[in-house]
Amino acid sequence: MKLFIILALVCYWLTCCAPSVAELAKTNPEAVVARKDELLAGKSVSKETLMAVVDAYNTLGSSALKAKNYNEAEKQFKESLVLDNKNKQANYGLAMIEGLRLFKKGNRSALWDSLEKFGKATYFDPTKGEPYYWMGRAYEKKDDGDFELIVEAYENALKGNLNPELKTEVENCLATVKLRQKTHESFWK
């Protein structure tokens, strides 16, 4: 009888105290991805389990994107889309990667295309300010005299969510552009 009670308590502890797949997707996404086939085996996979695997891929993709490892980020986001082809986080990540690659090319045509990709990223996650920051950078690189579009992009970036370092960068870029705009306007008066 004692053994039964101990076993029951151990089983209860394991089921109640072990992290859920959804929690693991955030804290240890590598483990979830490594066990993807096991988690998704069977005919009746729960939506929670499926979304946990999608979240794990997105977490890995976001980390790789932040580290500027675009190939790895792209791979992870594409894996996410295989499981959930309308996933906004994965689509946002892919749009940002494409935009950044085009921005890096630097030619006029690529800059126009990067603006389109950054705009697409804002569609998938309108709360983020980073795509607007890159739009401002692309407008500056394309035509640094187009002050209205540059200022608008940086101001939109500040309305969105930015990490503290990027927020400072955007504020500095905006101040510099406004100063150049003022100098330009006073010169031509």
Each PLM stretch: what is its role?
Residues 45, 151-189:
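Terminal, low-structured helical/coil segments at or just beyond the last alpha-helical repeat
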Residues 47, 54, 88-95, 129-130, ...:
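Helix-start (N-cap) detector for alpha-helical repeat units in TPR-like alpha-solenoids
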Residues 52, 59, 93, 134, ...:
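Canonical tetratricopeptide repeat
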Residues 62, 96, 100-103, 137-139, ...:
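Residue-level recognition of tetratricopeptide repeat
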Residues 84-127:
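Alpha-helical adaptor scaffolds
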